[in-house]
Amino acid sequence: MRILGIDPGLARVGYGVIDTSGGHQRMLDCGIIRTDPGRSDGERMVEIASDLRQLIRAWRPELAAVEKFFFYRSSNTINVVQARGVVMMTLARFKVPVVEFPPMQIKLALAGFGHAEKDEVLEAVMRELDLTEPPRPDDAADALAVALTGWFQR
């Protein structure tokens, strides 16, 4: 199964593509969709949708796993929610099934406990995908963690 993991944001959307065929998981691609901070929010959302469409066409994921956030007092909340909406809409247009996971569930799936530190989750990602170097940037590593959670929780 090919899974696209997504860590949404307006400035950067982390993505990671894994393949789980053959009895083990392997990373096919990871990176970020970076938007231009000098552009309007609407233009940045168009950038996210356009780049995500290209990823979907290139990798043909059978499942998308998206990190789900719960913000209460963050000034960044609206931007993340808007970017997440663009991600969800684009996935729906391509009929890619979506599963969503909050950060604690991702940490639990990979590190064994929901309050794991970022470096513990990163170590688990590297181990599960048999990587010798940590995926960079951090948003891409986070997206790979989301993709792996999608596989483990299917």
Swiss-Prot record:
Pfam families named in the record: RuvC
Catalytic residues (positions): 7, 67, 139
Its EC number(s): 3.1.21.10
Record: residues binding Mg(2+) 2: 67
InterPro entries: RNaseH-like_sf, RNaseH_sf, X-over_junc_endoDNase_Mg_BS, X-over_junc_endoDNase_RuvC
Gene Ontology annotations for the cellular component aspect, listed alphabetically: cytoplasm; Holliday junction resolvase complex
Main localization of the protein described in the UniProt heading: cytoplasm
Subcellular location: Cytoplasm
Keywords from the UniProt entry: Cytoplasm, DNA damage, DNA recombination, DNA repair, DNA-binding, Endonuclease, Hydrolase, Magnesium, Metal-binding, Nuclease
GO aspect biological process, one term: DNA repair
Catalyzed reaction equations: Endonucleolytic cleavage at a junction such as a reciprocal single-stranded crossover between two homologous DNA duplexes (Holliday junction)
Function of the molecule: The RuvA-RuvB-RuvC complex processes Holliday junction (HJ) DNA during genetic recombination and DNA repair. Endonuclease that resolves HJ intermediates. Cleaves cruciform DNA by making single-stranded nicks across the HJ at symmetrical positions within the homologous arms, yielding a 5'-phosphate and a 3'-hydroxyl group; requires a central core of homology in the junction. The consensus cleavage sequence is 5'-(A/T)TT(C/G)-3'. Cleavage occurs on the 3'-side of the TT dinucleotide at the point of strand exchange.
Entries under HAMAP family matching the protein: RuvC
Oligomeric and partner information: Homodimer which binds Holliday junction (HJ) DNA. The HJ becomes 2-fold symmetrical on binding to RuvC with unstacked arms; it has a different conformation from HJ DNA in complex with RuvA. In the full resolvosome a probable DNA-RuvA(4)-RuvB(12)-RuvC(2) complex forms which resolves the HJ.
Protein name per UniProt: Crossover junction endodeoxyribonuclease RuvC
Gene assigned in the entry: ruvC
